[in-house]
UniProtKB/Swiss-Prot annotation:
Record region (Small ATPAse domain (RuvB-S)): 192-262
Pfam families tied to this protein: AAA_lid_4, RuvB_C, RuvB_N
EC number(s) recorded for this UniProt protein: 3.6.4.-
Residues at which Mg(2+) binds: 76
NCBIfam families recorded: PRK00080.1, ruvB
Function (record text): The RuvA-RuvB-RuvC complex processes Holliday junction (HJ) DNA during genetic recombination and DNA repair, while the RuvA-RuvB complex plays an important role in the rescue of blocked DNA replication forks via replication fork reversal (RFR). RuvA specifically binds to HJ cruciform DNA, conferring on it an open structure. The RuvB hexamer acts as an ATP-dependent pump, pulling dsDNA into and through the RuvAB complex. RuvB forms 2 homohexamers on either side of HJ DNA bound by 1 or 2 RuvA tetramers; 4 subunits per hexamer contact DNA at a time.
The protein, known as: Holliday junction branch migration complex subunit RuvB
Catalytic reactions on record: ATP + H2O = ADP + phosphate + H(+)
Notes on the domains: Has 3 domains, the large (RuvB-L) and small ATPase (RuvB-S) domains and the C-terminal head (RuvB-H) domain. The head domain binds DNA, while the ATPase domains jointly bind ATP, ADP or are empty depending on the state of the subunit in the translocation cycle. During a single DNA translocation step the structure of each domain remains the same, but their relative positions change.
Region (Large ATPase domain (RuvB-L)): 4-191
Quaternary structure note: Homohexamer. Forms an RuvA(8)-RuvB(12)-Holliday junction (HJ) complex. HJ DNA is sandwiched between 2 RuvA tetramers; dsDNA enters through RuvA and exits via RuvB. An RuvB hexamer assembles on each DNA strand where it exits the tetramer. Each RuvB hexamer is contacted by two RuvA subunits (via domain III) on 2 adjacent RuvB subunits; this complex drives branch migration. In the full resolvosome a probable DNA-RuvA(4)-RuvB(12)-RuvC(2) complex forms which resolves the HJ.
Organism: Cupriavidus pinatubonensis (strain JMP 134 / LMG 1197) (Cupriavidus necator (strain JMP 134))
GO-annotated biological processes: DNA recombination; DNA repair
Region spans: Head domain (RuvB-H): 265-352
Amino acid sequence: MIETDKFSAPDRVISATPASSREEAFERALRPKLLDEYVGQEKVRGQLDIFMHAARNRREALDHVLLFGPPGLGKTTLAHIIAREMGVNLRQTSGPVLERPGDLAALLTNLEANDVLFIDEIHRLSPVVEEILYPALEDYQIDIMIGEGPAARSVKLDLQPFTLVGATTRAGMLTNPLRDRFGIVARLEFYTAEELARIVTRSAQLLGAHIDPLGSLEIARRARGTPRIANRLLRRVRDYAEVKGDGTITREIADAALAMLDVDRVGFDLMDRKLLEAVLHKFGGGPVGVDNLAAAIGEERDTIEDVLEPYLIQQGYLQRTPRGRVATAAAYRHFGLASPQAGDSGDLIDGE
């Protein structure tokens, strides 16, 4: 059984990014170990199952894999599953950590045959490190410089065959040469409420929590299509159920706990409402540029683009147009406001 501290929620309970190393440890404990245990992403799972099966039959390293999509959808989990299904070791790092070519060279030269190297935030690799990676991906070789000044010389080192699994939330920031070296490219999509309910039920069992189907579904509906958020909400609702109820998570208990956390029925929290209200009230529904919007709500541009916007756009509350962000009719309805006339909104989204 996995224990959690009472009411130790992160500042933004529906953030899709891990709040601390301790939360990452909880995630690892709840993480499915095999592809058959992995819920959702049916298309990606089906593709990986075939590609891994073929690579195992040929006793080869799996082709290099690029996983992209919003945070919290299971990219790291899939990297661990790939290594386990292939029966090999996994080495994990991230783009910002690999500051010098020697950092990457040390990782690559220590890989055993067919091992998996997982690089999270791969779009943040420095250009000089990325250059070292190209021959490693294509030919399983790296060039390193020995010595300094006029006496320096390049030495080519052979590597064991390996699989690079790269993960990113910003696929558009990858350079074309790097993107082209991945043989398998998969986009992870937001999960349905039914898929998330299955994940919540499974996680509750691992946590030793009692939950009924309607309780699972209530949490799932407010989890913004993201397993990481669903598991975080589950832990907070479990705390509430133990203190305010008999420990069983019902729909009513889940609703009360999530209301306490200020997560509404469509999964919006204060930050989501702040963003939408800024578009509606400060900028007349839009269009508004992302930099102006970031200044208006006191957030970083990257936070808006990577964390806040994807769910709002996917759910149809916000549009991204060439002229800026525009609130949709659904956003007006959510706040009980009258929508603008069709002619006015048509001018705003001209060119879409």
